């Protein structure tokens, strides 16, 4: 292996890796925003393999047929991010004229196949690429879960292997001639999956991120980090939704607070940080049941307070997407 192809050993670095470092083994080593002013920048720049990733033009061409690309993020696990992703996909796909795709990038904990009623399905490969599994005529789904020999198999991968799968999903999945919305479910926090998807999709453009939280401060602490990640990665924050905001009794329809907003909840956080607050969604046990059964919650309980709240959030999100397009047109 020639010197120009040698990966940098951490022992060669002049100083510890700073926060938000892309990693000395990354293609962005020495070139990222976090590299500016770093004592290691010259070392990383001189020894990293140069030249653009040959797969990037292929990814860009594949994704150029998709009108809107939305990332669904959460700072902490267990706040209902994947559940809300499934609700978002069902809600947009309710309009039969709109083609929707859902991509499950929560590689170590894929749950969208169960929630969308596609568990046990498999992916078919053709000359045009991988075909997503369609849970409705206008709603396709792609997940690593479809490739596992056993649904209970643990996925124990390091960053490089996760990165390779994400690249393959973006490069090889054939969503058809036209896709109106691609909703991407990501793992909680800021990890390899987030860095990979933002890097590969940067050229073709991401409409923005939807952040899901619950009202209590312990969840909001990590949301602040997620917002910081989006700003440093130049991802527009389309808005924040506060999930499990109150509990709706399925019998009396009364609402009570389960997770109290001790510091003002998501709405106050949005006011402090200047991001759109898209709304609050009450906790309804029937949502969990619908997800377990792989059924559309809106079909079963169209008049429930939770269904109304979710649809209001989806409308507000789509307004933000359109607003972003208008701002781009003005520029």
UniProtKB/Swiss-Prot annotation:
Binding of [4Fe-4S] cluster 1, residues: 21, 35, 38, 44
User: Where is it located?
Assistant: Cytoplasm; Nucleus
Q: Name one GO biological process term.
A: iron-sulfur cluster assembly
Main subcellular localisation: cytoplasm
Amino-acid positions noted as binding ATP in the UniProt annotation, renumbered to this chain: 75-82
CDD domains given in the database record: Mrp_NBP35 (cd02037)
Region described as Disordered: spans on this chain: 1-32
Q: Name one GO molecular function term.
A: 4 iron, 4 sulfur cluster binding
Q: Which InterPro entries match?
A: Mrp/NBP35_ATP-bd, NUBP1/Nbp35, P-loop_NTPase, YlxH/NBP35
**Gene Ontology CC terms:** cytosol; nucleus
Q: Where does [4Fe-4S] cluster 2 bind?
A: 249, 252
Q: How is the cofactor bound?
A: Binds 4 [4Fe-4S] clusters per heterotetramer. Contains two stable clusters in the N-termini of NBP35 and two labile, bridging clusters between subunits of the NBP35-CFD1 heterotetramer.
**Any Pfam family the entry gives:** ParA
**Cofactor(s) named in the record:** [4Fe-4S] cluster
**Keywords for this entry?**
4Fe-4S, ATP-binding, Cytoplasm, Iron, Iron-sulfur, Metal-binding, Nucleotide-binding, Nucleus
The text of the family note is:
Belongs to the Mrp/NBP35 ATP-binding proteins family. NUBP1/NBP35 subfamily.
Give the multimer and partner information. Answer: Heterotetramer of 2 NBP35 and 2 CFD1 chains.
The job of this chain, per UniProt, is described as:
Component of the cytosolic iron-sulfur (Fe/S) protein assembly (CIA) machinery. Required for maturation of extramitochondrial Fe-S proteins. The NBP35-CFD1 heterotetramer forms a Fe-S scaffold complex, mediating the de novo assembly of an Fe-S cluster and its transfer to target apoproteins. Required for biogenesis and export of both ribosomal subunits, which may reflect a role in assembly of the Fe/S clusters in RLI1, a protein which performs rRNA processing and ribosome export.
Name under which the protein is recorded = Cytosolic Fe-S cluster assembly factor NBP35
Q: Which organism encodes this protein?
A: Candida albicans (strain SC5314 / ATCC MYA-2876)
The protein's gene is named: NBP35
């Amino acid at each position: 292996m020639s010197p120009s192809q040698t990966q940098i050993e951490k022992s060669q670095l002049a100083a510890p890796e700073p926060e938000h470092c892309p990693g000395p083994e990354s293609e962005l080593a020495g070139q990222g925003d976090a590299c500016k002013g770093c004592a290691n920048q010259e070392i990383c720049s001189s020894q990293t393999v140069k030249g653009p990733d040959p797969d990037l033009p292929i990814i860009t061409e594949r994704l150029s047929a998709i009108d809107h690309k939305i990332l669904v993020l959460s700072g902490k696990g267990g706040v209902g991010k994947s559940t809300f992703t499934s609700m978002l996909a069902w809600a947009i796909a309710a309009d039969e004229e709109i083609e929707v795709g859902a991509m499950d990038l929560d590689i170590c904990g894929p749950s969208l196949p169960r929630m969308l009623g596609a568990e046990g399905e498999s992916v078919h490969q053709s000359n045009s690429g991988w075909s997503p599994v369609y849970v409705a005529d206008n709603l396709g789904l792609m997940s690593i879960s479809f490739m596992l020999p056993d649904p209970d198999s643990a996925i124990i991968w390091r960053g490089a292997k996760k990165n390779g799968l994400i690249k393959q999903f973006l490069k090889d999945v054939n969503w058809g001639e036209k896709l109106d919305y691609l909703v991407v479910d990501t793992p909680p926090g800021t990890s390899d999956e987030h860095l990979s998807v933002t890097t590969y999709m940067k050229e073709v453009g991401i409409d923005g991120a939807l952040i899901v939280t619950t009202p209590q401060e312990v969840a909001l602490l990590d949301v602040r980090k997620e917002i910081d990640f989006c700003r440093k990665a130049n991802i527009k924050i389309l808005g924040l939704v506060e999930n499990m905001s109150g509990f709706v009794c399925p019998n009396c329809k009364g609402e009570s607070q389960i997770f109290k907003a001790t510091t003002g909840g998501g709405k106050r956080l949005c006011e402090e940080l200047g991001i759109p607050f898209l709304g609050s969604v009450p906790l309804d046990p029937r949502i969990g049941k619908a997800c377990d059964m792989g059924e559309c919650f809106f079909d079963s309980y169209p008049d429930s307070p939770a269904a109304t709240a979710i649809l209001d959030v989806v409308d507000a999100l789509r307004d933000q997407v359109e607003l972003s397009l208008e701002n781009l047109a003005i520029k």
